[in-house]
Amino acid sequence: MRAVVQRIKEGKVTVEGEITGECNFGLLVYLGVGREDTVEDAKYLAEKIVNLRIFEDQEEKLNLSVKDVGGSLLVISQFTLFGDCRKGRRPSFSEAAKPDEADYLYQEFVRCCNDVGMTVGTGVFQAHMMVHAINDGPVTMLIDSKKTF
């Protein structure tokens, strides 16, 4: 499971002009599910992200998590995080999970975040979404549950 995590001042996602999720302050998480991912990957990544210390403390050091600062999450499914661009010019998505399994693990990730008290806004799985965000910093992290980077 892979995530691109961005610290944001605000964000929202719309599908066909309707807001489906929003975050007034916190983290925008683009989440990709790989074909070998399990519930354990969802749990690991949720715990890692909600406790990741990428918010500044009083000394302007990155010492606080989204939980510490009372922020929320906006989680967007994005299978393209498993796009392999090493050969040719068209990405291969063969390492991405099948839609049914990806949706299940995406929902499991959201549930794990909710279980630790996080407010989570979401997009719509497999929908064409418009994501609007005001990045803060910017601070952007790449996280992989298999620890490949």
From Swiss-Prot:
A motif (Gly-cisPro motif, important for rejection of L-amino acids) lies at residues 137-138. One of its GO terms (biological process) is D-amino acid catabolic process. It comes from the Bacteria. It catalyses: glycyl-tRNA(Ala) + H2O = tRNA(Ala) + glycine + H(+); a D-aminoacyl-tRNA + H2O = a tRNA + a D-alpha-amino acid + H(+). InterPro entries: Daa-tRNA_deacyls_DTD, DTD-like_sf. The keyword tRNA-binding applies. One of its GO terms (cellular component) is cytoplasm. One of its GO terms (molecular function) is Gly-tRNA(Ala) deacylase activity. Its main location: cytoplasm. Pfam families: Tyr_Deacylase (PF02580). It is found in: Cytoplasm. Keywords: Cytoplasm, Hydrolase, RNA-binding, tRNA-binding. Its EC number is 3.1.1.96. A Gly-cisPro motif from one monomer fits into the active site of the other monomer to allow specific chiral rejection of L-amino acids. An aminoacyl-tRNA editing enzyme that deacylates mischarged D-aminoacyl-tRNAs. Also deacylates mischarged glycyl-tRNA(Ala), protecting cells against glycine mischarging by AlaRS. Acts via tRNA-based rather than protein-based catalysis; rejects L-amino acids rather than detecting D-amino acids in the active site. By recycling D-aminoacyl-tRNA to D-amino acids and free tRNA molecules, this enzyme counteracts the toxicity associated with the formation of D-aminoacyl-tRNA entities in vivo and helps enforce protein L-homochirality. Homodimer. Belongs to the DTD family. This is D-aminoacyl-tRNA deacylase. The gene is dtd.
